[in-house]
């Protein structure tokens, strides 16, 4: 088992060393249509990035929202990676919700649009 795990880790890092740098594609949305005052789930899906060194934060009015859950790092064809982070939230008209993604030396902030 240890040998297999070591082999997989070595294969991922060896192959990723040859992959080209790629900035992330970021999508911010909610599980259900946005409705002020109703509990929902805020989701930030980040895909097509390489290398896998990345940080995702979900923010409410510029502050990190606690208790957010993140999927395990997964890779796609061409050694590009994807991650999803989500958290329960109750939107109000006064709050701004954002997904902040740090990849390599760049930081991007994408706001959630409530579609109301």
Curated annotation (Swiss-Prot):
Q: Which SMART domains match?
A: IGc1 (SM00407)
Q: What is its main location?
A: secreted
Location in or out of the cell: Secreted
Entry GO terms, CC: extracellular region; MHC class I protein complex
Q: Which residues form the signal peptide?
A: 1-19
Please tell me whether the keyword Signal is annotated for this protein. Answer: yes
GO biological process entries: antigen processing and presentation of peptide antigen via MHC class I
Give start and end of each Ig-like C1-type domain: 24-111
Disulfide cross-links: 44-99
- Check the record and name the PROSITE patterns matching this protein: IG_LIKE, IG_MHC
Which InterPro entries does the annotation name? Ig-like_dom (IPR007110), Ig-like_dom_sf (IPR036179), Ig-like_fold (IPR013783), Ig/MHC_CS (IPR003006), Ig_C1-set (IPR003597), MHC/Immunoglobulin (IPR050160)
Keywords, ordered alphabetically: Disulfide bond, Immunity, Immunoglobulin domain, MHC I, Secreted, Signal
Pfam families the UniProt entry points to: C1-set
* Similarity comment: family membership: Belongs to the beta-2-microglobulin family.
Cite the record's note on assembly.
Heterodimer of an alpha chain and a beta chain. Beta-2-microglobulin is the beta-chain of major histocompatibility complex class I molecules.
What role does it play?
Component of the class I major histocompatibility complex (MHC). Involved in the presentation of peptide antigens to the immune system.
What protein name does the entry list? Beta-2-microglobulin
Species per Swiss-Prot/TrEMBL record: Ictalurus punctatus
Source organism lineage? Eukaryota, Metazoa, Chordata, Craniata, Vertebrata
Gene name per UniProt: b2m
């Amino acid at each position: 088992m240890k040998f297999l795990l070591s082999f997989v880790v070595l294969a991922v890092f060896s192959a990723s060393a040859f992959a080209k740098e790629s900035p992330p594609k970021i999508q911010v949305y909610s599980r259900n249509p946005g409705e002020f005052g109703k509990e929902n789930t805020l989701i930030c899906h980040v895909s097509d990035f390489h290398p896998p060194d990345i940080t995702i934060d979900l923010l409410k009015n510029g502050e990190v929202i606690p208790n957010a859950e993140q999927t395990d790092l997964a890779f796609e064809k061409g050694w590009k990676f994807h991650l999803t982070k989500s958290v329960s939230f109750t939107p109000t008209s006064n709050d701004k919700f954002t997904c902040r993604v740090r990849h390599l030396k760049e930081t991007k902030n994408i706001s959630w649009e409530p579609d109301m």
